[in-house]
A protein has these predicted regions:
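Helical "lid/coupling" subdomains associated with nucleotide-phosphate turnover
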Residues: 1-14, 29, 37-39, 46-205
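Short aromatic-hydrophobic micro-motifs that form the base-stacking/packing surface
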Residues: 16-18
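Ser/Thr-glycine-rich phosphate-binding loops at phosphate-binding pockets of nucleotides
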Residues: 21-26, 111
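Internal, well-ordered alpha/beta segment that forms a basic, Gly-enriched binding/recognition surface
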Residues: 32
């Protein structure tokens, strides 16, 4: 979280950090206010975690769970599975109110969200300087999800920022992103192509 410190907007009270992995997805709902203090001291202050959960849905596990279904059937079932995992969080009034009032935003960090961002930006090759720190609206990202679903698994690898290695996992990744964003339908997502290494370096200063 420290590595994503400067991605927190100054007027933000709360941040929902979504980290999509292969076997799980980590959700951290944090108090962003301590991060607003200036200088190195503020940079090293870890925002207090108000709520945290590790969900047993990742791009690999979700892909494997629905591999027996055709794509057009698999996606809605993947999405329904993800939505079932976050039902309790969706009903949390504090989270709903923070995003409804504009006091919160999402930070997304994972290969899935960075690949989706690259496609959304129309990059002909992956560029970290364009992706890291970029803002994505829900409308723009969901438009990319629909584009990838229409292309299908057979053509997923043709998108430059996806390629062959990640193509087989993107359908599940799209379902997770769509499901997670339902927690903050009015919130934009700040994209982070960073994480543990940057946080460790800052902690050593």
């Amino acid at each position: 979280l420290i590595g994503c410190h400067n991605l927190i907007e100054p007027d933000t009270d709360r941040v929902l950090v979504i980290d999509i992995g292969g076997g799980s997805t980590e959700l951290s709902y944090v108090d962003a206010r301590p991060a607003h203090e200036g200088g190195l001291k503020g940079l090293l202050r870890k925002p207090p975690i108000l709520a945290w959960r590790s969900l047993p849905v990742g791009v690999v596990t979700l892909t494997e769970a629905f591999a027996h279904l055709p794509e057009e059937e698999a996606y809605p079932q993947m999405l329904a599975h993800v939505m079932g995992q976050i039902d309790k969080w969706k009903r949390a009034p504090e989270i709903r109110e923070a995003f409804a009032s504009g006091r919160a935003h999402v930070i997304g960090t994972s290969g899935t969200v960075t690949c989706l961002t690259g496609v959304t930006l129309g990059l002909t090759k992956y560029r970290r300087d364009k992706v890291d720190g970029a803002w994505m609206t829900r409308e723009a990202m969901m438009g990319t999800v629909e584009k990838l679903r229409a292309a299908g698994m057979a053509k997923m690898h043709t998108f430059p920022t996806i390629g062959t290695d990640r193509a087989g996992l993107m359908l599940a990744g799209c379902a997770i992103v769509e499901g997670m964003w339902s927690l903050a339908p009015r919130g934009d997502m700040r994209i982070a192509d960073r994480g543990l290494r940057e946080g460790l370096l800052l902690s050593m200063m």
